[in-house]
Amino acid sequence: MKQVRWFSCIVVVLFLSIFMAGQSIASENMPLADGLYAKLITSKGDILIKLEFEKTPLTVTNFVGLAEGTKDSNRGKGVRFYDGLTFHRVIPNFMIQGGDPSGNGTGGPGYNFPDEIDPTLKHDVPGILSMANAGPGTNGSQFFITHTKTPWLDGEHTVFGHVIEGQDVVNAIRQGDTINKINIIRIGSKANTFKADQDSFDALFTQLRQKKQ
């Protein structure tokens, strides 16, 4: 009887292990909803972010254009701007910051663009992707991802995405860790027709500047 019970327990444990493994694999392979995504491949792991390209088109055009090298910058035409840069600033229980080619918080792409604040996008949960700046209208290439909700940043920094996978990686990032590569994923007709080149950036820049006047 004892052998039968032990065998039954082993079967149950094996079944649960296989089931849980299957659930984990299924969740990892779940298809993404239509949208525009950025996959940050870092030295600590991958971070998948959904970009708010409809609510903050200029900011997302800038980010995607720099990531893919389809937009002009001071790193050279056609260069994937973010690849190989570091997270130069990390404040525990606050945020991680990257996107500076100088590596010390003073650099950028060679230009600035206006804030693009959408009141429906807030720093209200962990994993918010937002633009770093040195005051109004000083956005460039630097961005940060939050560890926790940071409501005092609302209205001061442009929120343009949020983490949907890899918040544990965000929390594990330390100063000096590397952004190996940023891949942009387009799913659905709207995302596939979204352009992130210099002409698109210039047109959106002009529209936003006129709107603010």
Can you name each region flagged by the protein language model?
Residues K2-C9, F15-Q213:
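Cyclophilin-like peptidyl-prolyl cis-trans isomerases
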